[in-house]
Amino acid sequence: MKSALCSRFFILLPWILIVIIMLDVDPRRPAPQLTSRPYFSPHAVGCGGSRVPLRRSSPGRDAAEKRNESRPQLQPEPRLPTIYAITPTYSRPVQKAELTRLANTFRQVAQLHWILVEDRATRSELVSSFLARAGLPNTHLHVPTPRRYKRPWLPRATEQRNAGLAWLRQRHQHQSAQPGVLFFADDDNTYSLELFQEMRTTRKVSVWPVGLVGGRRYERPLVKNGKVVGWYTGWREDRPFAIDMAGFAVSLQVILSNPKAVFKRRGSQPGMQESDFLKQITTVEELEPKASNCTKVLVWHTRTEKVNLANEPKYHLDTVNIEV
C-alpha cells in the first residue's frame, strides 16, 4: 500500500512543479535588455581585488554637469579696508580696566589693527602681557611726554599720537598702501559697533557727533544738504574744526599723502589740536558726514571715576602680588 502511494506521488510531482512555474511567470513583464557594457569592469579593482562599480551616465546628470561647468565662478569678496586705531595710554590704577573694555569692543570689529602707545620710556610689563592675551592684531609703541609739557592746561598725548602716525608712514613707505582708515581712540571712550561700519567707508575725512563732551550732552557737526556748514559745540564755535578727537576718521591714503601732518606743540593753543591737525589735510567743505548726517551719537567721551585707594595698606601688604 505504501509503495503504491509513493509511486503515485513521484509521478505527479513533476506536473505539480510545472503548474507552479507557469502560474509564477507574468507574460506582460518586459524582458530585460541586454547591454554590452558591464556594470562591473573586469579591470577596475580596488584593494584586495574587489570589483569597483563604474559610474553610469544619465541624460539628467550630464545636463546638470554641463550647467555647472558653464556657470561663472564667484569672485572673492573685496578685502575690507583696515581700521587703524591709535590709542595713547599711561600708567594709572584704572589703566588695565580701561584697556580691557576697549579690547572687548575692538575684538568684535573685523580687520582692525590696534596701535597702542604708552607714555613712558620703555614698555611696561602690564601692557605687554595684556596685548599678548588680547587676541588682536596690534603694535606696541612707547614714547615719553617731556616733563615741561606735563601741565594740567596743556594738551595730552601729543607725542603718542604722533608716534602712531610715524609708525603708519614708515610701515607703508616702501609698499603700496592697502585701503585703510585711521582714527584716534582714547582708552577711556565708549564705542558703538555701528561707528566702525560708518567710518570704514571714509574716502578722505569723515566726521560724526560725540556724546558727553564739551560740557554738553553731545557736540556735533551741523549738516545741510549733505555738507558740514557749522558746529554745535559748547566751546569756541569759531574754531575751524570745532570737533573732539573722537569725532573724526582719516583715510590712510590721506595720511600718507601728507607726511608732514602731525599734532603740534608749538603754535597750537589749548583745545585747538584737532583743528590744527585737520587744517593740514582737508577743508570743511570736504568733510564727509556720517551717523545719519551727524544726527546719531555712536561714541561717548566717558571718564572713569577717580579711584579711592585711601585704605590701601603701605606696610602690611598682601603676600600675593596681584595685577589690577
Curated annotation (Swiss-Prot):
First-tier enzyme category under EC: transferase
Positions of transmembrane segments: 3-23
Glycosylation sites: N68, N293
Lumenal topology ranges: 24-324
Signal peptide: none
Reactions catalysed, as given in the entry: 3-O-(beta-D-galactosyl-(1->3)-beta-D-galactosyl-(1->4)-beta-D-xylosyl)-L-seryl-[protein] + UDP-alpha-D-glucuronate = 3-O-(beta-D-GlcA-(1->3)-beta-D-Gal-(1->3)-beta-D-Gal-(1->4)-beta-D-Xyl)-L-seryl-[protein] + UDP + H(+)
Region Interaction with galactose moiety of substrate glycoprotein: start-end pairs: 235-244
UniProt binding sites for Mn(2+): D188
Subcellular location, record wording: Golgi apparatus membrane
Bilayer disposition of the protein: Single-pass type II membrane protein
Tissue-specificity statement: Expressed in brain, but not in liver and kidney.
Positions annotated to bind UDP-alpha-D-glucuronate: P88, T89, Y90, D119, R156, R161, D186, D187, D188, H301, T302, R303
Main function: Involved in the biosynthesis of L2/HNK-1 carbohydrate epitope on both glycolipids and glycoproteins.
Protein known as: Galactosylgalactosylxylosylprotein 3-beta-glucuronosyltransferase 2
Organism, as annotated: Mus musculus (Mouse)
